[in-house]
Each structure stands twice: as structure tokens, then as C-alpha cells.
């Protein structure tokens, strides 16, 4: 389990890259398959390509930054993780919504791009996604969403 430091994948990553990681920075030069960042708990993940379906599923904290596209059900059932995607998102998961990019988010994206040696992409090109916070506590009115 990744707790700190930097892991740099010099190509593509298979399923569940960065699963349950608590800290540090994971850089993937290529694409990441399904469930990238599943249940992440504080790690920052930068994918220079695209991510597959169910990425950031039940992600609790940290950041997932995707320079390409994202597959189905991005951010399904996530908590406080912030997701940034430059390309297209096929679909958002349950309780995941697009959110406003404020100056502090532009700064965060800029820092991650710099740490990952990405200088041809501007932070303003990304969209931000996060939890709508409807599923934090059980509510009978939302039972069909669980």
C-alpha cells in the first residue's frame, strides 16, 4: 500500500492503479485501466492519458488528475476526493457532479502538472468533479441511489 513518496509508471497501468493508497504521488505516463484510484485515501494520482470505468470509485480523499478522457461511472460513491479531467467524461457515477473551478483548484492542478513534468497543458483546461454529498448518511428518500 502506498503511503508516501513518488511512484512513476513509465507506460500504461492495469486495473486498480493506486487502490487504497494513503499518500504520495502516483504518476502514470500512459493510460490507466478500470478502477484507477479505487478507495484512494489521500494519494495524488496523475494520469497523462485516459482512465477506464469506475475510476475513483468510493475514493475518500486525495486527487485524481486525468489529462485524457474518463470512462463510465467516474467518481461513483466518492467522498472528499477531488477529480480533474481535461478530456471527455463518458458518465458520472452516483453522487458525483461537476463543480466550479475556483482559483484554489487552478493552483492545485498547476502544482500537480508541475510535479508531473507536464508543461503543455494549462490548468484552466480541466473540469472539476466531486461528491454531491447526498449519500454521506442513509436517507430513505435516496434509497434508489444506493
Go through the PLM ranges and name each one.
Residues 8-10, 15, 29, 35, ...:
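Intrinsically disordered, low-complexity terminal regions
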Residues 3-10, 22-25, 41:
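Tandem repeat protein-protein interaction scaffolds
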Amino acid at each position: 500500500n502506498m503511503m508516501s513518496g513518488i511512484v512513476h509508471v513509465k507506460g500504461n497501468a492495469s486495473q486498480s492503479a493506486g487502490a487504497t493508497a494513503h499518500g504520495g504521488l502516483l504518476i502514470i505516463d500512459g493510460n490507466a485501466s478500470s478502477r484507477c484510484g479505487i478507495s484512494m485515501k489521500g494519494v495524488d494520482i496523475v494520469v497523462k492519458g485516459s482512465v477506464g470505468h469506475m475510476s475513483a470509485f468510493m475514493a475518500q480523499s486525495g486527487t485524481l488528475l486525468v489529462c485524457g478522457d474518463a470512462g463510465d461511472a467516474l467518481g461513483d460513491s466518492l467522498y472528499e476526493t477531488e477529480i480533474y479531467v481535461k478530456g471527455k467524461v463518458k458518465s458520472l457515477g452516483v453522487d458525483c457532479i461537476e463543480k466550479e473551478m475556483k482559483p484554489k483548484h487552478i493552483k492545485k492542478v498547476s502544482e500537480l502538472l508541475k510535479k508531473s513534468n507536464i508543461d503543455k497543458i494549462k490548468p484552466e483546461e480541466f473540469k472539476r468533479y466531486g461528491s454531491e454529498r447526498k449519500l454521506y448518511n442513509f436517507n430513505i428518500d435516496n434509497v434508489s441511489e444506493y
